[in-house]
Amino acid sequence: MENQQPSKAALLSVIPGLGQIYNKQKAKGFIFLGVTIVFVLYFLALAAPELHNLITLGDKPGRDNSLFMLIRGAFHLIFVVVYVLFYFSNIKDAHTIAKRINNGIPVPRTFKDMIKGIYENGFPYLLIIPSYVAMTFAIIFPVIVTLMIAFTNYDFQHLPPNKLLDWVGLTNFTNIWSLSTFRSAFGAVLSWTIIWALSASTLQIVIGIFTAIIANQPFIKGKRIFGVIFLLPWAVPAFITILTISNMFNDSVGAINTQVLPILAKVLPFLDGALIPWKTDPTWTKIALIMMQGWLGFPYIYVLTLGILQSIPNDLYEAAYIDGANAWQKFRNITFPMILAVAAPTLISQYTFNFNNFSIMYLFNGGGPGSVGGGAGSTDILISWIYRLTTGTSPQYSMAAAVTLIISIIVISISMIAFKKLHAFDMEDV
């Protein structure tokens, strides 16, 4: 039996490849060494200058574009981080292989054996490499750039290339709390965003589940007709529906005030002659937005829930009937738990989606009416406030990036807690 020293193999791997060569995996060792040589050449020729520019963000206005330097630096930083992960994996690999050799476990030595081992044991990982590469540059890279911008002074007074950007640390985050204008705006917008996400999402979920339960009842005739009707809000493009309903809620000539309310006034006399300020009063605008999202969002929940209901065995309901359970007890103990067990991730995603539902806020009333300071309208949510911060006459890109990071932290934290509490991905008990 061979006697390898794992600590010696790990120590030799400080120069990638040497530990593998020590373990008599020469093919792997030379590949690791080759990767390192290529990286060193790349780092000296390309990455090092760009990372230096990332730190300084330029020193001569007009010639140096700080924003481009930041983006290019972030791009090369990804490759450096990937190599660092490879570097430490190389040390761990040498140490692990040495221990396996000492334990008499066969290890691939030749290039042919290594390829065979990768094909037999690592083929699934090879298939997902393109996905990881795409995710890195489509998701992680923009996130890194946004994160970096949040720590700069990128605004209308510092627009590259005529002006240089500077690193300002946590200034943008502290300004949200220290500057009265931004503090009041952030508090108002955040509170409305939370109310909006909870109210609108809950409404569309309740309507969707309710209509699905009704449509699934055996005594309902013409189920296909009901299905088509319930899917209409989903079939029409959302932006068309939003613009149409926005016109219907017009204070003076909208169909709601001129036609619907007079009809309701015959049943509800207190509505006689009422003209509700849907578009000019923030409270009524918020109510209209919540109702509209309930209408737009429930068809998806309806389709999802209907499929779940049709998969629930009738034996459960028959047993509950024999035990004397009423309709509410059947729903609470059978129907709702089954819906929640299957659809919990989707239901949670409705809340996260509405937390960032920009289109309805922008198309319905442009975030108005009125303003709460800091460039935010009275019905702006965080994502639409970010839009205002970046497209206004005095854009605040770094502040918008800071708010974006705050949104991300809130959404990710709440989603992870909800997934964990609801055991959203635990399907063993379904």
Question: Where in this protein do the model-derived segments appear?
Answer:
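Central hydrophobic cores of alpha-helical transmembrane segments in multi-pass inner-membrane proteins
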Residues: 8-16, 204-205, 209
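A structural signal for multi-pass alpha-helical bundles of membrane permease subunits
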Residues: 44-54, 60, 91, 123-430
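Transmembrane helix recognition focused on a "late"/terminal membrane span
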Residues: 1-9, 27, 31-120
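Alpha-helical transmembrane segments and their helix-start/interface "positive-inside/aromatic belt" motifs
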Residues: 15-35, 121-128, 227-233
